[in-house]
């Protein structure tokens, strides 16, 4: 029997939910969004996670469980509450200059939550794997450009094409080159301690 109460995929997604809830309760995002309903939906998702954590289901029964379906449905609802597709760009572009950096950080954490929830079913479909790395999404991308980090000689900043969108990532791999295929982990470094160590092990999205 698989112990779902210790499944990293479920634990990481629920932790991201808690962090997201704290952000949308306190952050001053500027834009046309339904803050009240987003908070309510994130709170209501807790019972789904609790039920899923102690379901001890396996295989298709776990992947296709009502709890997983409800979590994903609520995740999609939160995206709508935030403003739909492009909500992250709206919040960042509307942020005052003095709050831009903090807004980008908060948006990154909320996006991690959204990715964790909407991708939960696919990760659970991989089966009972007892490894923390399974709790995050990893996608393959192509490096489009590489530049040195302005504040750290041991880091590189890369523009990576994921197909549907391009992102900026930071890595300590000094041998990366344009045209390389790389694996990119989708998680905010603050969710893992110590963040510096984790960033040295994984490609980390920064925008």
Residue ranges and their predicted role:
Residues 1-207:
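Phosphate-backbone binding interfaces of nucleic-acid-interacting proteins
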